[in-house]
């Protein structure tokens, strides 16, 4: 007969993360740790583990970050990005159901991997958008002289 693992609590998650080498910081309602030099928060409530990754954005390039976040959301269905109310940070969130440490040990690395993939996708999207903006600003409008010459050379068939 298979025995059930004891009920999982935030404190047991913290201990497991310490054993796995995440160097977490225990807070009253969550656990804070780092993913690729970005702040990550883990919350646990009613058998749902939520891992959130936060990183700062440039306020002047808000629109670019917003568009890149939307594209990231479409490319990574398991990760939900959100720009926070202060307009200075983006949060990527990944949730999974889990009621024991054995499952937690299995699902946490997957969630972190998905968050890293989403962060990489977001960086790629930002680079694409910046490059597209540079290309758009590099185009030079045609002069009226070049447009006027087209009419003389083309015949319109009706």
Spans of features found by a protein language model:
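Short, highly charged C-terminal tails/helix-capping segments
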Residues: 127-158
